[in-house]
Amino acid sequence: MIILPAIDLKEGKCVRLYQGDFKASKVVAEDPIEVALKFKENGAEYIHIVDLDGALTGQIKNLSIISSIIKTINIPVELGGGIRNLNTIDMLIDAGIERVILGTAALNNRGLVKEAVKKYDRKIAIGVDAKNEKVAINGWLNVSSTNYIDFAKEMENIGVRNIIFTDISKDGTLKGPNLNQLKKLNESVSCNIIASGGIKDIEDLKVIKEMDIYGAIVGKAIYSGNIDLNEAIKIINKESSR
């Protein structure tokens, strides 16, 4: 299982949210490039970045910092937040983004998902962000009537291979992930599932790994010191090689 440390960007800084609430954002680092470098030094093989300003506005807002991170760390980066059309996807892939995450656009525009998957295949991931099992969009401000499992199945049928699942009520809480919803999703589709939201310690990571989940995104638990990234990667890799 791959561990993806998270960088959430707001106005050029690293922040953490609580249950997706933009008003409750807290700056955890002034220099995201420094954070990314530290993640790399601690053994990260992949970094998860969200442009929170982009998620709200529908346009990438932190591109210069994201580009600097890519050039500086030289390990794969996946990016979500504000990606709404194929031109933006083209631009991001050209800029060196390894995997582009579609959320709002995927729910509102199935045609875009089809086009993007046809052109970029595994480089496209879908963010399935759920609130009470319904898919939330537009920076998690609006909750649709679409069930998260139904949405994931539809994305799989289009050809999507990677799904990032977040239970919004758990995000930033350090109360543990929603294992029931995660299990249901993993049993319902054959896509690679990356778990996000609420992971609080190494035990959570071990449980997720035992569920045969492809990856786990860890944010607040690293910034708060609950998880030592280097130690977590070593432990999870050791368990993988048994």
Curated annotation (Swiss-Prot):
Keywords for this protein: Amino-acid biosynthesis, Cytoplasm, Histidine biosynthesis, Isomerase
Pfam family, one: His_biosynth
Residues the record marks as active site: D8 (proton acceptor), D129 (proton donor)
GO terms under biological process: L-histidine biosynthetic process; L-tryptophan biosynthetic process
Superkingdom per UniProt: Bacteria
Record-stated family: Belongs to the HisA/HisF family.
Listed GO MF terms: 1-(5-phosphoribosyl)-5-[(5-phosphoribosylamino)methylideneamino]imidazole-4-carboxamide isomerase activity
Pathway of action: Amino-acid biosynthesis; L-histidine biosynthesis; L-histidine from 5-phospho-alpha-D-ribose 1-diphosphate: step 4/9
Protein name in UniProt: 1-(5-phosphoribosyl)-5-[(5-phosphoribosylamino)methylideneamino] imidazole-4-carboxamide isomerase
Location(s), subcellular: Cytoplasm
Catalyzed reactions: 1-(5-phospho-beta-D-ribosyl)-5-[(5-phospho-beta-D-ribosylamino)methylideneamino]imidazole-4-carboxamide = 5-[(5-phospho-1-deoxy-D-ribulos-1-ylimino)methylamino]-1-(5-phospho-beta-D-ribosyl)imidazole-4-carboxamide
Signal sequence segment: none
Keyword Cytoplasm: yes
Keyword Cell membrane: no
Enzyme kind, highest EC tier: isomerase
EC number: 5.3.1.16
Main location: cytoplasm
GO CC term (a single one): cytoplasm
InterPro entries: Aldolase_TIM, His_biosynth, HisA_bact_arch, Isoase_HisA-like, Isoase_HisA-like_bact, RibuloseP-bd_barrel
Species in which this protein is naturally found: Clostridium botulinum (strain 657 / Type Ba4)
